[in-house]
Amino acid sequence: MAARRKQSGKGGAGRTGQAAAPQDRRAARREQRRAAILAAALEEFVARGFAAARLDDVARRARIAKGTIYLYFQDKESLFQELVRTMLSPLVGTIEAAPLRDVPIRSVAEMIVDVFIKEIYGTRRKDVIRLIISEGPRFPKLAEVYYREVIARVLPVIRGRLALAVERGELSRDALARFPQLLVAPALLAVVWNGLFGRFAPLDIRELMHAHLDLLFGEGSAT
């Protein structure tokens, strides 16, 4: 009888594994479909703007029925909000977790610049920022979610490190600590400028940002 119970136990474990496999596949398909919807939404929002973008066209790009979108997102606004979270929140988490206290302030600034250039300007994330800039005034909730998910998390980190730099004598004035927006202002300028005038007079964002850091901290890279 013990042998039969042992065999029965093995069979039960096998059945559990067999049952789990279809569930895993369904979960993977759901995640793939969700990612496809978000990718299609980004293309539509960039091509048409938030106001003119239609969920019908998002569904067509994602090659799904329109009704499928509502299984994942309540409406177009919630779809856009999730796009912001999905694309930018992990990057924000990386900045929040970075060990910045014991790094020279110029090195901190260069790290932030490099992250912006590689992970935002060099990717489709810059299109999300352009959308926020262009559509935010007409759709305040879109600006609100960007502020909550990105700015309200990153700005205190930067401000705190700049204030520490003032205390330590790394910075002779507290202007940057009071207005940390100054640190990244040229990066946003480059996003807007190259979106509007890049065909005529493109800005080299890396050269622009390092010239800006030289103005703020003196010439030369940190060691």
Regions found by a protein language model. Name each.
Residues 77, 88, 137-140, 154-155, ...:
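Short alpha-helix boundary/capping elements
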Residues 32, 36-43, 47, 61, ...:
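Alpha-helical structural segments
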Residues 120-148, 192-196:
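Amphipathic alpha-helical segments used for helix-helix packing
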Residues 144, 166-214:
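Hydrophobic/aromatic-rich alpha-helical bundle segments in the mid-to-C-terminal region
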Residues 1-48, 52-64, 72-78:
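Basic, helix-initiating cap at the start of DNA-binding domains
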Residues 53, 79, 124-128, 141, ...:
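Alpha-helix N-cap and coil->helix boundary residues
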Residues 67:
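Key DNA-contact positions within bacterial/archaeal DNA-binding proteins
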Residues 219-223:
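C-terminal effector-binding regulatory domain of bacterial HTH transcription factors
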